[in-house]
UniProtKB/Swiss-Prot annotation:
Ranges for region Disordered: 1-26, 128-150
UniProt motif SPKK motif 1: location: 139-142
Any coiled-coil regions, as ranges: none
Subcellular location field: Nucleus; Chromosome
Keyword DNA-binding appears in the UniProt entry: yes
Record protein name field: Histone H2A.1
GO MF annotation terms: DNA binding; protein heterodimerization activity; structural constituent of chromatin
Function, as annotated: Core component of nucleosome. Nucleosomes wrap and compact DNA into chromatin, limiting DNA accessibility to the cellular machineries which require DNA as a template. Histones thereby play a central role in transcription regulation, DNA repair, DNA replication and chromosomal stability. DNA accessibility is regulated via a complex set of post-translational modifications of histones, also called histone code, and nucleosome remodeling.
Source domain of life: Eukaryota
Record PTM N-acetylmethionine, positions in chain: M1
Similarity annotation: Belongs to the histone H2A family.
Length: 150
C-alpha cells in the first residue's frame, strides 16, 4: 500500500486534499436572509412530523421572511408618521392593528408595551351644528333690519 493512494486525513471524504470550495448556504441558494438551516433544525427538533422534506425549511423561511418584511415596512411607516427614527412596540402595534390581514392573523396576540388603538365612539363626540349654522346669519349686522320709522 502506497501512501500516495490513501486519502489524507481531514479531507472530508474527498479524494486528495486540494483547495476546498467555499460552502454555499441554502439561504444563499434560495436568495433568502432568514436561515434555512436553522429553520430546518427547528422543524426536526420540534417533532412536528417524523420526517421533514428538503423544501419545507426553505418554504417556511421564505414565508417568515416575507411576514417580517411586511410588518417592518408598516411599522417603519408608522414610526415615520410619528416623526421617530426608531421602531418601538407602539409602532408595531399600530402597524399590525391598522392592517386588515395582519390584524386578522395576529388577532389573539398581545404586543407588550404596544398600548391600544386610538378610538373614540362617535356618540361621545360633540354634535356638529351645520343645519342651525346654515339657516341663521353669521353676524347680526347682516341680518335683515326692520324698516326705520319716520
Amino acid at each position: 500500500m502506497d501512501a500516495s493512494t490513501k486519502t489524507k486525513k481531514g479531507a472530508g471524504g474527498r479524494k486528495g486534499g486540494g483547495p476546498r470550495k467555499k460552502s454555499v448556504t441554502r439561504s444563499v441558494r434560495a436568495g433568502l436572509q432568514f436561515p434555512v438551516g436553522r429553520v430546518g433544525r427547528f422543524l426536526k427538533k420540534g417533532r412536528y412530523a417524523q420526517r421533514v422534506g428538503t423544501g419545507a425549511p426553505v418554504y417556511l423561511a421564505a414565508v417568515l421572511e416575507y411576514l417580517a418584511a411586511e410588518v417592518l415596512e408598516l411599522a417603519g411607516n408608522a414610526a415615520r408618521d410619528n416623526k421617530k427614527n426608531r421602531i418601538s412596540p407602539r409602532h408595531l402595534l399600530l402597524a399590525v392593528r391598522n392592517d386588515e390581514e395582519l390584524g386578522k392573523l395576529l388577532a389573539g396576540v398581545t404586543i407588550a408595551y404596544g398600548g391600544v388603538l386610538p378610538n373614540i365612539n362617535p356618540v361621545l363626540l360633540p354634535k356638529r351644528k351645520e343645519n342651525a349654522a346654515a339657516s341663521t346669519p353669521k353676524s347680526p349686522s347682516k341680518a335683515k333690519k326692520s324698516p326705520k320709522k319716520a
